[in-house]
Every structure is written in structure tokens, then in C-alpha cells.
Amino acid sequence: MKQKIIGLTLAFFVLFLTAVAILFTVKVQRYLTTSLWAKLSEQTFLVFKNEQDEAQFNQVSWTNFQAETTKKEDKKAFRLYKKKISLEQLENENQQQLFQAVNLSINLKQGWYNITILLPSKALFETVF
């Protein structure tokens, strides 16, 4: 009898954890596909290293992204920067120092894409603002 109670308790506990995990996954996916996409679709802040990367990025419909950096400046720049800068503006070495390369991993239905983009550095924000 005691083993039966322990078994039922464990079964309910596992079922509870599974339900919590499913609800969490659905909530996170909903946030990524609605809230995050709505915020990002209004902004044009990506500066690509070359036209091939830009063409590849524009062709796919992406549902999730993750900036692979721990630097707060990069993340802040990624969120705040709204103006697309042409590559001609980066020809000057002084201007090149205003940008930093950040690797972007994009999770698509077709798989993972790793794209390196240029984001404005903290120095650019100090110059502009």
C-alpha cells in the first residue's frame, strides 16, 4: 500500500512538472513570436558585413533570434539603434571603430543560421547623442 501511494505521488509530480514545462514553453514561444517580433519589425538597425549576408537574412522569415554577446553595450545598441547605415559610411577607419561585430543566431524552421552583423558601439552613441 505504501509503495502504491509513493508511486501515485511520483506520477502526479511528474505530470505536474510536465504541465508546467509545456505551459512555460508555450508562453515563451508566444512572447518570441508576438511581442518581440512586433518590437523588432518596427526597427531597421541591422548593418551587414556584406550584401550576401543581408540578402540571406532578408529572404528568410525568422521567428526567434539570440544575440550571442554578454556585453551590455552591444545589447543596448541592438535594441536602440534604428537607423540603417550604408557600408560606404564605414570606409573611414575612424568610423569603423564606431561599430562592433556581433554574431546573431537565428532559429528558423529550416534550421539555425549564424549571421555576423555590425552594430553601433558605445562610442557611436556618444558621438550621435
Curated annotation (Swiss-Prot):
Membrane-traversing stretches: 5-25
Intracellular or extracellular location(s): Membrane
Keywords in alphabetical order: Membrane, Transmembrane, Transmembrane helix
Superkingdom to which the source organism belongs: Bacteria
A Gene Ontology cellular-component term: membrane
Membrane topology recorded in Swiss-Prot or TrEMBL: Single-pass membrane protein
Main location: membrane
Protein's name in the database: Uncharacterized protein MG389 homolog
